[in-house]
Amino acid sequence: MPPAETRKLDDIAKMIVCKTHIGTKNVEDKMLSYVYKRTHEGIFLINLAKTWEKIQIAARIIATIDNLADVVVVSQRPYGSRPALKFAQHTGAHAMVGRFTPGTLTNQITQKFMEPRLLIVTDPRVDSQAVIESSYANIPVIALCDTDSPLQYVDVAIPCNNKGKESIALMYYLLAREVNFLRGKTDKWDVMVDVFFWRDPEEYENSAIGADMELNDGMGVDIEGAAVDSAAAANEWGGVSGNWGGSAADEWRNAP
């Protein structure tokens, strides 16, 4: 991997492209230390240097766990479902996307009960049920926090835009890269950040249909011409003379 300072500058440039620094018009008191400045429109901007530092801290915490299957990634926000699943795929963690079943971390008689050693959430406000239950079970929490995110029961806050699909994907991408690097699994990260982006199923289906139509056009498939050729072939077969109504026995009987 490139030197730390070069990697830091490259990562910050990616964060700017993915709009990770754009916060909201509200700010929590505990998030003020991560704010860079406030624009004329009233939007608070996040200090990306502190974001990068918090990613390094969170990655070191995750890397200390022997079995990464004990790390649970929770995301009820739709834009965070695919990044959470990809993070789990590349690190070996366990992902829980969609609705979080109450009692998963506290009720031992439920089928989905689990006792993770670490919890990662995409948004502490949306995933508040998981954060509250982790406080009952004494489970550390790492959270992607926007300027208006509550930090109660959050142990490590990664300041970022946790509402944009590009920003969420980039955060999980960088976190997975650092975890694998610290655990010695890879020296070169070949995975593209685009793989972590959330994709709309309807948009993906429409694009697939459009690609098939373009492929057919490129192959020169003429549906109308094919129909005309089929009709001509049918007429040709229909004009063939012969006793098609005779039985097979008559044909064999008259054979020399």
UniProtKB/Swiss-Prot annotation:
A GO biological process held by the record: ribosomal small subunit assembly
GO cellular-component term (any): cytosolic small ribosomal subunit
Location within or outside the cell: Cytoplasm
Keyword hit for Ribonucleoprotein: yes
One Pfam family of this chain: Ribosomal_S2
UniProt keyword Acyltransferase, yes or no: no
UniProt cross-references to InterPro entries, sorted A to Z: Ribosomal_uS2, Ribosomal_uS2_CS, Ribosomal_uS2_euk, Ribosomal_uS2_euk/arc, Ribosomal_uS2_flav_dom_sf
Keywords, in A-Z order: Cytoplasm, Ribonucleoprotein, Ribosomal protein
Transmembrane segments: none
Entry's Gene Ontology molecular function annotations: structural constituent of ribosome
Its biological purpose: Required for the assembly and/or stability of the 40S ribosomal subunit. Required for the processing of the 20S rRNA-precursor to mature 18S rRNA in a late step of the maturation of 40S ribosomal subunits.
Assembly notes: Component of the small ribosomal subunit. Mature ribosomes consist of a small (40S) and a large (60S) subunit. The 40S subunit contains about 33 different proteins and 1 molecule of RNA (18S). The 60S subunit contains about 49 different proteins and 3 molecules of RNA (25S, 5.8S and 5S). Interacts with ribosomal protein S21.
Annotated family: Belongs to the universal ribosomal protein uS2 family.
Protein name: Small ribosomal subunit protein uS2
